[in-house]
């Protein structure tokens, strides 16, 4: 909740400057999230930046954060929606791939098409999801679902594959 406030506070001035109605709806209760704060912050900022970039003056950007239950598990739900240009249907299935950009480019852009891929990778690392709902000419809604607690990390299994050179420097396990 504190993190969400820190991130959204930084967009209020932009909203005023651009003439965009920016609404923030957040929980009043804490969520227990085991996250990489920098990565999650970056993902949220990326989505908010895109929302502002593609929304015209007098448009709306909405940030909502709540707790939801899915199949008995608690998730933090972060919804970022806008009344911007929307994403063409032919791009929606590939929008989270690297270097994908659309025709609806803002007037000034230095985009390279990796922002949404970074969001997707961040959510994958946190055992979460990112979903898109978009209507061309009406706007887009991105929903992030981040598992609450830390039980989801028990699912991680890693296999370390080494080379003969690595074995020379390996320390024996107790």
Protein language model annotation of sequence segments:
Residues 13, 85-86:
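Glycine-rich G1-box
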Residues 16, 21-31, 68:
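Conserved catalytic submotifs in the C-terminal HATPase_c
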Residues 51-52:
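Short helix-loop "hinge" at the ATP-lid/N-box region of the Bergerat-fold HATPase_c
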Residues 87-99:
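Short conserved segment of the HATPase_c
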Residues 100-110:
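Glycine-rich ATP-lid/hinge loop adjacent to the conserved G-boxes
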Residues 115, 119:
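Short alpha-helical Gxxx[C/S/T] motif in the catalytic ATP-binding
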Residues 123-124:
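Detector for a conserved hydrophobic position within an alpha-helical segment of the HATPase_c
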Residues 127-133:
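Glycine-rich ATP-binding loops of the HATPase_c
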């Amino acid at each position: 909740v504190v993190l969400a406030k820190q991130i959204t506070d930084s967009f209020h001035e932009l909203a005023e400057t651009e003439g965009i109605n920016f609404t923030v709806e957040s929980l009043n209760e804490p969520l227990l999230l085991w996250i990489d704060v920098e990565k999650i912050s970056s993902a949220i900022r990326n989505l908010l930046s895109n929302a502002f970039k593609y929304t015209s003056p007098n448009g709306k950007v909405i940030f909502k954060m709540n707790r939801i239950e899915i199949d008995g598990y608690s998730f933090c739900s972060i919804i970022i929606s806008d009344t911007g240009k929307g994403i063409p249907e032919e791009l929606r299935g590939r929008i989270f791939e690297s270097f994908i950009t659309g025709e609806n480019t803002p007037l000034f852009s230095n985009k390279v098409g990796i922002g949404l891929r970074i969001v997707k990778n961040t959510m994958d690392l946190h055992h979460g999801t990112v979903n898109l709902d978009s209507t061309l000419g009406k706007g887009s809604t991105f929903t992030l679902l981040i598992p609450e607690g830390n039980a989801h990390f028990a699912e991680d299994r890693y296999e370390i594959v080494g080379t003969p050179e690595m074995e020379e420097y390996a320390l024996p396990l107790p």
